[in-house]
From Swiss-Prot:
This is Protein E2 homolog. Belongs to the poxviridae E2 protein family. It comes from Fowlpox virus (strain NVSL). It holds the Pfam family Pox_E2-like.
Length: 717
């Protein structure tokens, strides 16, 4: 469990520097901790922005992904190579990679070259050689078939006008290439077609900057520019052109003010919604017409555009109802809470903004208090909150944050080490941490530091080899292309030692026939499995047995890319839902032995599957796995396979079967009826209506977490 008691004691024993920020105070205290404790905290995700040299070796040994916390000269090249080979996103290691520029350059590793070339500024000569070797026809064919290659070619090679025209007219590829520069007058239609079809600002700017002066100053280009302006397209980029080339100002119409000193009064024109949208974007260029524009928007109840010019609405027209209408209708163009007048920031408006996903809810503290946020069960904490000074202006907000996240090392790092917390707020945070640490509920929180005992299966074993196999003699076969693959080794070990109840293996043999490496065997079905319900109960017991012997699998086929969040306080359940949004499949199939990986390899597989940029501890991932197993079997099992009156007993059997599979003798008897009620609600809904983030089965999530906590403590005794 995340514990910073010693850090707090060290912090409180130091003398304060008046007005100083915790970055110097708390970080100094952190660096005085014993090395073993620092390693433990860093592994959990709690650490300052920099660490001193004395911690390098243990940190590199136990959490090599955190070497970016050290100065580049402290980092060993070997550890850097480990990081490069492990991660795809190396942005956190830029300084270290640049420090070892020479060593990486002479490493002769294509993987190092590929991953570091952008950071080190390598030029890809290999791509240039391939491009130059191809004929024009082959080049076009390859660009058509391989978009990635096409991007490289357009960036590196000057293409002929013929190729650019062919790629544009046949394949709709804009001529964003240096070959456009020498275009002649007879090809001007090609250029203006491409310019008119270009909608991205960067593409339009490229075409205008790369084309030669003769074409750029032609009447055809000027007309095309005016057509784009009249459509309200690429205004920011085209302002450059209008300011440098003589065009007919009268043709700019209502958009004249955007390009030149204000002249036109907006009421002189009949305005469409599209033109109003452009005008509102450049409202400061229409200062004389602002009252008319606002009146028009108000009269037409155009709240979406009013949201974009909210700072220009006259005070006499402002009221709470107007703000509520703007919030209700402006889904794609949310105004900032700071743009609202404080006297109209009501509790009702805050709830409405929260339900519509406003990130800056914390700014309601301009007029409301934290108690109002609490009363409405709103969680005001997100990335935006950390860009404000509210934690230093309102210590009640600090108290609320600590109550939510006092056992979450990552969230506590964000507050105590990454946010410039002032002395007063730091003191409040420390006091709140001490208060909540003393009242921790051990029945709800997982102890990651109590090592889970894995009973390893023997690594060396023999399986009988058969040259001739009669498939009629066997009811099961598992085949592989290679006998060197990871899945082959895992499957063979599981089949040989026959530890599962749902897959009782008899007459196992191995054969290499027709380039396939196959296991033939018979499965004996346990007498206790009479239907899907009993199958699931036996099956989750097998998942426990597999886990006990160090074999785990993922649940992404059911929960997608959702990752369990286990380090939050029970209080937070009332403010936000922490489970998966949906279930991809409401059917649980039989166990697939090919799907399992070894416990020691799980972090590497997890990193790849969920595309994260840091390594998680095996012990943490173990409980992610346990939590996901329980949630999957209780949720999908109860909803799909079990009658309502039997859900309570099914859940109890699922939990105890899993615990027994782990080799734990104790059992869990007490079960909240609220869990059953939540599952019945989900069961009654059509499958396409079962959005969990709307139903919020919080009691079910709490149950799964409580079982994890039980396994981490009582289950190991």
């Amino acid at each position: 469990m995340f514990d910073i008691t010693n850090l707090i004691e060290l912090y409180e024993s130091n003398d304060y520097v008046s007005g100083d920020y915790k970055h110097s105070q708390l970080q100094k205290a952190f660096l005085k901790l014993p090395i073993t404790e620092v390693v433990m905290l860093v592994k959990s995700g709690f650490y300052p922005s920099k660490l001193s040299k004395k911690f390098y070796k243990p940190i590199a040994k136990f959490c090599v992904d955190k070497i970016y916390l050290f100065k580049p000269e402290y980092v060993s090249l070997k550890d850097l190579f480990t990081v490069i080979y492990t991660f795809d996103d190396l942005s956190k290691y830029k300084e270290i990679i640049r420090y070892y520029y020479y060593e990486l350059s002479v490493s002769n590793s294509y993987q190092v070259y590929k991953k570091c070339k952008n950071i080190l500024g390598y030029k890809d000569e290999y791509d240039n050689d391939i491009i130059e070797e191809l004929s024009e026809n082959d080049l076009v064919e390859k660009m058509v078939n391989f978009p990635g290659f096409r991007k490289i070619v357009y960036k590196k090679k000057i293409l002929s006008i013929r190729i650019l025209k062919e790629m544009y007219y046949k394949h709709k590829v804009l001529p964003i290439n240096k070959g456009i520069t020498p275009i002649r007058e007879e090809d001007i239609c090609f250029f203006i077609d491409a310019l008119y079809d270009a909608h991205d600002d960067d593409d339009v700017l490229y075409l205008l900057l790369e084309i030669n002066e003769q074409i750029l100053d032609s009447d055809e280009v000027k007309e095309t520019i005016i057509r784009k302006i009249c459509k309200g397209e690429n205004i920011d980029v085209l302002r450059y052109y209008v300011s440098h080339y003589l065009i007919d100002h009268a043709k700019l119409g209502v958009y004249y003010n955007i390009f030149f000193s204000e002249r036109d009064i907006i009421s002189e024109y009949g305005l469409t919604d599209e033109s109003l949208k452009v005008i509102c974007k450049y409202i400061d260029r229409y200062s004389s017409s602002i009252p008319s524009i606002i009146k028009l928007l108000l009269d037409n109840s155009n709240y979406t555009l009013l949201a974009s010019v909210i700072d220009y609405i006259p005070e006499e027209r402002l009221n709470e109802n107007l703000y509520m209408q703007i919030v209700r209708h402006s889904n794609d163009n949310k105004p900032k809470i700071k743009s609202f007048k404080a006297e109209f920031l009501s509790e009702c408006l805050m709830v409405m903004c929260y339900l519509r996903g406003y990130e800056d809810i914390v700014d309601f503290l301009i007029a409301l208090d934290v108690e109002t946020i609490v009363r409405n069960r709103i969680n005001p904490f997100n990335d935006y909150t950390f860009t404000t000074d509210w934690f230093n202006k309102n210590t009640e907000l600090v108290r609320l944050y600590i109550s939510f996240y006092f056992i979450d090392p990552v969230m506590m790092r964000k507050l105590l080490f990454e946010y410039p917390l002032c002395e007063t707020s730091t003191t409040v945070a420390i006091e709140e941490l001490k208060k909540y640490r003393s009242s921790i509920n051990n029945n709800y929180n997982i102890d990651y530091h109590e090592e889970f005992k894995i009973v390893d299966l023997p690594r060396s074993f023999n399986i009988p080899i058969s040259e001739v196999v009669s498939t009629k003699e066997y009811n099961s076969i598992i085949s592989f292309i290679s006998d060197k693959s990871y899945k082959f080794k895992i499957t063979s070990q599981l089949l040989k030692y026959n530890i599962l109840q749902t897959i009782k293996v008899e007459n196992l043999c191995y054969s290499h026939i027709n380039n396939l490496h196959s296991f033939y065997f018979n499965i004996t079905k346990p007498s206790g499995i009479i239907d899907n319900i009993s199958r699931l109960i036996y099956q989750i017991g097998d998942l426990g047995r597999l886990l006990r012997h160090g074999f785990l699998s993922f649940t992404d086929n059911y929960f997608g890319k959702w990752i369990p969040s286990l380090n939050y306080s029970k209080i937070l359940d009332h403010y936000q839902y922490n489970g998966p949004d949906y279930v991809l499949s409401w059917q649980i199939g039989k166990l697939d032995l090919k799907a399992f990986v070894k416990y020691k390899d799980f972090p590497k597989f997890f990193l790849t599957k969920y595309n994260i940029d840091f390594l998680l501890e095996k012990e943490v991932l173990l409980y992610y796995c346990i939590y996901s197993y329980l949630l999957l079997y209780i949720l999908v099992g109860s909803v799909t396979y079990v009658e309502q009156e039997n859900i309570y007993y099914f859940i109890t059997n699922i939990i105890n079967s899993f615990i027994q599979g782990l080799g734990i003798r104790n059992s869990i008897d007490s079960l909240s009826e609220e869990v059953v009620k939540e599952l019945i609600i989900i069961q009654k809904l059509p499958e396409n209506k079962r959005k969990l983030s709307s139903i919020r089965p919080v009691s079910l999530l709490n149950l799964c977490k409580r079982v994890c906590a039980f396994i981490s403590r009582d289950g190991k005794k």
